């Protein structure tokens, strides 16, 4: 488009800016349009070309299906690994808890046995003391009877 086909008309001028109006001249018949008005006509496809396109589409479909199946298999494998790891961690936790409980029970048993042994020792000491007091008392009783 030539510059002589364009007219610039100033509409108003303000502090905020200016406004213009562009007036375009009529199109010349010599200028070719920049884009075609209608899409180019498609050529008629032969049976072989159609068959090739169908086969290519089938290959793409099969390839896509294989990719999806591969992704599903990988996902299932990952799920199996995660599940196996969770089971293993659970077993380890159970084993550790059982060992801890067994150790605690053994410690409690040893503590209880030690307390029982200490009580028995105190009872023996008391019995021994009582026996000594009895012997001392029996030894003193005949003498006390004479003095009364």
Swiss-Prot record:
Signal peptide: none annotated. Residues 4-145 form the SLD domain. It holds the Pfam family Stathmin. The gene is STMN1. Belongs to the stathmin family. It is found in: Cytoplasm, Cytoskeleton. The modification Phosphoserine is found at residues 16, 38, 63. Residues 122-148 are annotated as: Disordered. It comes from Gallus gallus (Chicken). Its main location: cytoplasm. Residues 41-140 form a coiled coil. GO terms for cellular component: cytoplasm; cytosol; membrane; microtubule; neuron projection. Binds to two alpha/beta-tubulin heterodimers. This is Stathmin.
């Amino acid at each position: 488009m030539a510059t002589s086909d364009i007219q610039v008309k100033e509409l108003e001028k303000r502090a905020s800016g200016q406004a213009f109006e562009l007036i375009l001249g009529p199109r010349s018949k010599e200028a070719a349009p920049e884009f075609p008005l209608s899409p180019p006509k498609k050529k008629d496809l032969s049976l072989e070309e159609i068959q090739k396109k169908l086969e290519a589409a089938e290959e793409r479909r099969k390839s896509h299906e294989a990719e999806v199946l591969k992704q599903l298999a990988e996902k299932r494998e990952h799920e199996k690994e995660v599940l196996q790891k969770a089971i293993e961690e659970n077993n380890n936790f159970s084993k550790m808890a059982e060992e801890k409980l067994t150790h605690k029970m053994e410690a409690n048993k040893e503590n209880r046995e030690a307390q029982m042994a200490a009580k028995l020792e105190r009872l023996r000491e008391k019995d021994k003391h009582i026996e000594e007091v009895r012997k001392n008392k029996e030894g003193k009783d005949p003498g006390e009877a004479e003095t009364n």
